[in-house]
């Protein structure tokens, strides 16, 4: 697991430090704050991020019509190589940057499968910046979470790496 974290940390352009642990509720197992969110998958079903507890989680906002879109290939390669060691990649489609993700969730899923064979987890398309950004991205970009990484993300394929133990 340490090798996995070192390889990923060195390979990523931007990453976040591990999130502090907080209790879900009194007496419950501790779950890192970054996993205290529920979102929807591309299929519309609820995804409770706490299911990734104990994993290395790489959260990436993605878009299918961006100059960085070929990063899907590298993300899939990381998934193929390290998923068995506890790596989870969460793709989070967003249309916030240059309207480069105009498709529906179904179109995004088809694009990712056809062009990159994406098998890692993909969440539904959501806002990741501005006043209407989803709570997960509110947390990831919050000054209270880590002042070094606070503020709006700059573009598609911004990465947050956390050890969710």
What is each PLM-predicted segment?
Residues 1-3:
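Positively charged n-region of N-terminal signal peptides that target proteins for export
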Residues 5-15:
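Bacterial N-terminal signal peptides
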Residues 22-50, 135:
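N-terminal "domain-start" segment that seeds a small globular fold
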Residues 41, 61-65:
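Amphipathic alpha-helical repeat scaffolds
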Residues 55-56, 64-65, 69-93, 113-116:
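Conserved helix-turn-beta segment immediately C-terminal to the redox Cys motif
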Residues 86-103, 119-130:
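Thiol-based oxidoreductase modules, predominantly thioredoxin-like and allied folds used
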Residues 117-165:
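Thiol/selenol-based redox catalytic cores and closely related redox-interacting motifs
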